[in-house]
Design a protein with these regions (language model features):
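Proteolytic maturation boundary segments
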Residues: 43-70, 262-350, 354-356, 415-419, ...
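M16 family metallopeptidases and their MPP-like homologs
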Residues: 70-72, 77-94, 100-102, 120-173, ...
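OB-fold/S1-family RNA-binding modules
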Residues: 723
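Metal-associated gating/positioning segment near the N- to mid-region
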Residues: 108-120
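Active-site His/Glu-centered metal-binding helix of metallohydrolases
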Residues: 101-109, 341, 601
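Hydrophobic, small-residue-rich alpha-helical packing segments that form membrane-like cores
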Residues: 184-252, 256-258, 263-271, 278-288, ...
Length: 965
């Protein structure tokens, strides 16, 4: 797998301010320190900032051979562990004849190692992992980027004998014992070609072509990990082995292990396992290639027929913070400050996005690595625009950047940004005993690769709660001035190659950059309302009955207006309560003629805001709170979803009340929505894949009027008033709504708020259910193959099988077995043996409403010249499964994964929310007897299940290919 861009960090020296920090490091350190003037490295090196502690819960060490390791015991998930090996190497280190081999090598790590050869001497890495429920792609994966390569084994069931030892052995082999057999290399060439085919999008081609302009004379001018297809097809075996032996070595590798483990025991095992990995003699220097400064602006403009929408990126380059200078309070403060600036500027840009005629369809700012280079940082702004709005978008980005640089931000903007930051920090602190292994792994990998600090949440929470309130707005505004220098400017514009589409010239862009300081601008005015979310509480209802010990250990409440509530308290997360409210009806209630309106209803309603607050104002009034509520219209249900911190439960109840009773009409926001939607739909037409979904929907539903394929010309037909009328109809009667709450909810605290707000929801006691809209999937065999011009010749093939099947827990489990078995079969037969695709994806859906039916979908992409052969293999393997069932090996692998996943789900709030909903919506307990059914499944069960589906004779095949030349 290729990481599209490296992981990015924020940070740099900040500006001259004095801060009194009391009780830092839990009252052990009181310090007044200076954050240096500007981003001047020479000044920064003179500053003596207090060092940050290293999280005491992680053990960090280094073996004699140079290998670094991080080991931590963590409780959750129980009996699980994460095993990572991070390498400080990537595509930047390739020689010209090796372009693409860093990524190729990553693939080869899964195709034979010393202890997992994948031949008659022993199982390979993937087959062995799957025997213990570690699924390839889900729990077993890797990525190659420009400066790093990272492999992972995740969610390993270490309570099973030998799993921990074997995972260590895999890391050991990845470090120094990948076999790189000739025949395996040749087989993998095809897989890499198909990965290139699937990823070689218009925007990637543009960026690749522009790199020499963005990085003139620098090593980063040719560094994309996919490399050269000519190299992939023809490189001699020696070239990849040379790269491997030169760069995969212990002094550039870090092992990270976090899980429900004994740290002492794992450390001892690691030392023993890696003892035979030799320290390199006279190793090649690992160079971090610099990026040159530029006095005059660099402007890179590129186009491609398959780029969706025009995009603009503006970079103001800064010197990167050396890894050795990150582990101090000054760096932590600088991260905070640049984060606040981006947050405040993003809020301004979002306001413009919501305007009636927005200058861009999206816009944001950031402080991170400069494009793809980790040796230079940059303050950046980016936006997407309408096809005819490139210059307007660019001008507006520059205008807002200059406005912020010249006038700074306001106290109210800073207060909101800081409140949101501290809320997020508090949430992480509250979850410190519930944090999962993966969160720590990501921190330690970044510490190894990039020197990012790892003080631990307790120390960070204490420090930042002292530091953040003491960094004044004046400091932020001074930093903003430093972030936008007159030199080191880079502008990248990418867009569709379309007749009549006008792009600014390089000279015009430079003129705009140089004219920033002469713009006639006024300071931003922050319009803030002091009005509360609700001026007065509604006249609440009452809880008329309460029953403890209901389904799944929930408590059932019935309110005086008919609303039914189920509350399940859990301790899985400390700072989360989830909510769902649902009622039967949904889109099915409305006639076919309203299809366009109900297709966009959710988005249209959301843009208006609630009560007296626009969407922009609502964001402001909710600053510092962890809460969200949104409504949605499904095919057969209307729903309201919410999540909050326990302390913000009343706010979630207020938002829910307003969602039912006070959707807000905002004509300007609606016009903005329409303009942005038109632009996005027009842009999407450039993407060849946009047509495959339309073709599939037409094939499935035989052009049913309720299937809406949105086109730009349809946007003006959307009826805002009708949408509001339809929405109000669905939410004017709460008497048949059932609400579910799952999470860290205190029932006695919640009950009066539930009664006050949910009990006050309108009720007219309608008795209704959903309607059958006769939207049936096409019967019989249907095939549609069509050709479409593509820059990278690709065939995309979709198979869809449908039929009747009872909605039962066993059938749901059988469908999961079937899709997982097919995934493994197709990986072996189509990806590995044929080298014909990057992956075949299988999806299944078992439906009860409006009628019971089963769907099985299979999708893959390949070389058009191979499509018929591979499609034949896909169909043949499906028929084999229907005739003979799966192999015992595949059957057992799926069982292992499903039982592991089931055990993990028991401590997930989302899992129990879904079960509560399913119990009442489907009238079925989807947990009772689950493990017994999984264990009882036989190959014959799966064979019959798939055979019963195929016998019904309903097959749709849609293929998009390229015209014959």
């Amino acid at each position: 797998m290729i990481s599209p861009l490296p992981l990015r960090q924020i940070g740099q020296e900040t500006i001259l301010i004095f801060i009194n920090m009391k009780h830092l490091f839990h009252s052990l350190l009181a310090v007044a320190f200076v954050l240096c003037a500007g981003f001047q490295q020479a000044v920064a090196q003179q500053m003596q900032f207090p060092p940050l502690p290293v999280d005491k819960n992680v053990r960090i060490g280094q073996l004699d051979n140079g290998l670094t390791y991080y080991i931590r015991h963590n409780k959750l998930p129980e009996n699980r562990a994460e095993f990572y090996i991070a390498q400080k190497v990537g595509s930047i280190l390739e020689e010209p004849q090796q372009r693409g081999l860093a990524h190729f090598l990553e693939h080869m790590a899964f195709n034979g190692t010393k202890n997992f050869p994948g031949d008659d001497k022993g199982l390979g890495v993937i087959p062995w992992c799957e025997t213990v429920g570690i699924k390839f792609g889900t729990n077993l994966n890797a990525y190659t980027s420009i400066d790093e390569t990272v492999y992972n084994i995740s969610n390993a069931p270490i309570d099973r004998t030998g799993v921990l030892d074997s995972c260590l052995l895999i890391l050991h082999d990845w470090s120094n014992y990948i076999l790189l057999k000739d025949d395996e290399i040749d087989k993998e060439r095809g897989v890499i070609r198909e990965e290139w085919r699937s990823r070689n999008s218009g925007i990637l081609r543009v960026y690749t072509d522009l790199l020499p302009t963005i990085y003139p004379g620098d090593k980063y001018a040719d560094c994309m990990p996919i490399g050269s297809i000519d190299v992939i097809n023809n490189f001699p075996y020696k070239d990849i082995r040379d790269y491997y032996h030169k760069w995969y070595r212990p002094d550039l590798q870090g092992i990270v292990i976090v899980g429900d483990i004994d740290v002492d025991a794992v450390e001892a095992k690691l030392k023993a396992v890696f003892a035979d990995v030799q320290k390199p003699i006279n190793p090649a220097e690992r160079t971090y290639y610099p990026v040159a400064d530029n006095k005059e602006p660099i402007v890179a403009i590129g186009t491609d027929k398959e780029v969706d929408d025009p995009s603009i990126e503006i970079y103001f380059k800064q010197d990167a913070t050396p890894d050795s200078e990150k582990n101090n309070v000054g760096y932590l403060a600088s991260q905070y400050m640049t984060s606040m600036i981006s947050s405040m500027l993003d809020a301004r840009l979002n306001e413009l996005v919501q305007s009636a005629n927005p200058p861009f369809t999206r816009a944001s700012s950031d402080y991170s690595d400069f494009f793809v280079a980790k040796t230079k940082e940059a303050f950046s702004l980016s936006a997407s625009s309408k096809a005819d709005g490139i210059e307007t978008a660019l001008k507006t980005l520059l205008q807002e950047t200059e406005r912020a640089r010249r006038f700074g931000f306001t106290e109210s903007e800073y207060a909101r940004a800081r409140a949101n930051y501290l809320q997020s920090l508090e949430s992480a602190y509250n979850e410190r005993e519930k944090t999962k292994h993966g969160s720590y792994v990501r921190e330690y990998v970044q510490n190894f690769l990039n020197g990012e600090p790892i003080p631990g949440i307790e120390a960070e929470y204490a420090m930042m709660n002292q530091l953040a309130p003491n960094i004044p707005l004046q400091a932020m505004n001074m930093v903003m001035q430093q972030l936008v220098p007159d030199s080191n400017q880079v502008v990248i514009i990418a867009g569709p190659a379309k007749k009549g589409l006008k792009y600014p010239t390089k000279e015009e862009v430079i003129s705009l950059l140089k004219g920033m300081k002469d713009l006639d601008l006024q300071a931003y005015v922050d319009k803030v309302s002091d009005e509360p979310l609700m001026k007065e509480a509604p006249k609440g209802g009452k809880i008329i009955s309460e029953k403890e010990g209901d389904i799944y250990g929930s408590t059932k409440l019935v309110l005086s207006n008919g609303v039914t509530v189920y509350v399940k308290k859990t301790d899985f997360k400390a700072d989360e309560i989830r909510m769902k409210g649902t009622s039967l009806g949904g889109k099915s209630i409305f006639p076919d003629k309203d299809a366009l309106n109900f297709a966009v209803m959710d988005n249209v309603i959301a843009v208006g805001g609630l009560g007296n607050f626009s969407q922009v104002d609502l964001t402001k009034v909710l600053a510092g709170k962890k809460v969200s509520v949104n409504a949605g219209l499904g095919a057969t249900t209307e729903n309201v979803f919410g999540t909050c911190s326990p302390k913000d439960f009343e706010t979630m109840m207020q938002l829910t009340y307003l969602t039912f009773t006070a959707p807000r009409k905002d004509t300007e926001a609606f016009e903005s929505f329409k303009n942005r939607m038109k632009a996005q739909l027009e842009s999407a037409q450039a993407n060849p894949l946009s047509s495959i979904n339309d073709s599939l929907q037409k094939a499935m539903y035989n052009n049913h009027p309720r299937v809406v394929m949105m086109k730009p010309e349809m946007v003006d037909q959307i009826d805002y008033d009708r949408i509001l009328e339809m929405y109000n109809d669905r939410f004017k009667d709460a008497s048949d709504f059932t609400f579910y709450f799952v999470g860290n909810i205190d029932l006695e605290t919640a009950k009066p708020l539930i009664a006050e707000y949910l009990g006050a929801l309108p009720a007219i006691n309608r008795k209704e259910t959903f309607k059958d809209t006769k939207m049936s999937i096409r019967k019989g065999v249907y095939k549609n193959e069509y050709a479409k011009e593509q820059q990278t010749p690709t065939a995309t093939i979709v198979f869809l099988y449908s039929g009747k099947a009872p909605y039962t827990l066993k059938n749901d489990i059988l469908l999961s077995f079937a899709t997982q078995v097919l995934d493994m079969v197709y990986t072996e037969e189509v990806r590995e043996k044929e080298g014909g695709t990057y992956g075949v994806n299988c999806f299944g859906d078992l439906q009860k409403y409006p009628k019971e039916q089963l769907l099985l979908q299979i999708v893959f992409q390949t070389d058009p010249a191979k499509k018929d052969k591979l499609a034949g293999i896909v169909v043949d393997e499906l028929k084999k499964l229907a005739a003979k069932g799966p192999s015992d090996v595949h059957l057992q692998k799926v069982k292992e994964y499903m039982l592991k996943k089931y055990a993990d789900n028991q401590k997930e709030n989302g899992y129990w929310m879904n079960n509560l909903n399913d119990y009442f919506y489907y009238g079925m307990d989807m947990t009772e007897g689950y493990t017994d059914i999984v264990n009882s499944i036989t190959a014959k069960d799966i064979q019959k299940f798939v055979s019963d589906l195929l016998k019904q004779g309903n097959e749709i095949e849609v293929t998009m290919t390229v015209p014959n030349k």
